[in-house]
Amino acid sequence: MIVLVAGANGRLGGLLVALLLGRGHTVRGLVRRQDEAGALEEIGAAAVVGDLRGDIEWAVDGCDAAIFAAGARHRAQLEAIDGGGAAKLAEAADRFGLRRFVLCSAVGAGAPERRQGPLRDFLAAKHHAERRLEHLDMPWTILRFGRLTDATGTGRISTVVPPGTPVTLSRDDAALAVAEALDRDRLARRVVHVIGGDRHVADALDAVEPAPLPPVYNSGLGAGQADNPPPDPEMLLPDASPLDADVDYEGEGPLPPELVGNDDPAPGIP
C-alpha cells in the first residue's frame, strides 16, 4: 500500500515509517518543514511538506491509507493539531476513498470531561478527532495508547485497561500495533486500547471484539446523536486517568513526550 504518515519526524512516527518500509509499503511522510525531509528520504520514504492547519488534501491524493501520528508541541496548539488537524486529514482521506485510516489517540480520550488538571485539554483534543471520525464512511481504526515510553519493545500488548492502574506502552510496540492494525480490515470502525501487556501484538488485535465508537456524549464537547448512547468503556474507569501518572504537563510550554504524537523533536510552530 501507499501509506501517508502524518508526524513522520516524531519518535513514534519515525519508528512507524521504518517499520512500514520494512513490510514492503510505500511511505509518504508528512513533515512541517523542508529541512526535515532528508532523514525520511535517506531511509527510502517520500517526504511531503505541509501544515496540518492548512490545505493537506494534496498529500492524501494517490494514497491507499493514512495514519495520524502527529501532535502539537504546545498546549495552545492542541485543538488545531491533535483535534482539527487529525479531523482534517481524516476527512481528506474519506473524500479520496482511502482503504484504511488509523488514528493514534490516547487512553482517556473516551471521556475527557471526567479528567481533572491539564491533561484534560490534551484528551479533549483527541476526543474531538475521534468524534469526527464517527461521521465518515471510510474504514477507520482508533488506537488509544497508554503513556508512551522509550523502553525496548517486547512485541506484546494488552487491549484491556485495568481500572486505577497507570498504563504505559513502548513506542516500539505502539508502532507495531499501528502496522498490524493497518492490515486488519476487521478492525474497521473500531476503538482499541493498546497498553503494555503479555500477548503478542497480532494475537491481541485478532482477539479484539470492541463495540463500535459510540455517539458523542452531551458533555459540552459535542452534541449527542442518540437519546441513550452506549457508554464508552472509559466511562467505567475511575475519574483519575491511567495516563496521569508521571506526566509533567503544566502551563503553556512544550508538551511532554509521553503524550501521543507530541514527541516531534523539531522546533515549535510559530
Regions found by a protein language model. Give the residues of each.
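Structural motif
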Residues: 2, 64-65, 100
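Conserved dinucleotide-binding and phosphotransfer motif residues
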Residues: 23, 43, 136
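Glycine-/Pro-rich loop/turn segments that contact NAD(P) or position catalytic residues
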Residues: 72-161, 166
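Conserved beta-strand positions in the Rossmann-like core of class I SAM-dependent methyltransferases
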Residues: 4, 28, 48, 141
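N-terminal Rossmann NAD(P)H-binding glycine-rich loop of SDR-like oxidoreductase domains
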Residues: 1-25
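Mid/C-terminal beta-alpha module of Rossmann-like enzyme folds, strongest
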Residues: 2, 9, 172-270
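NAD(P)H-binding glycine-rich loop region in Rossmannoid oxidoreductase-like domains
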Residues: 29-88, 92-95
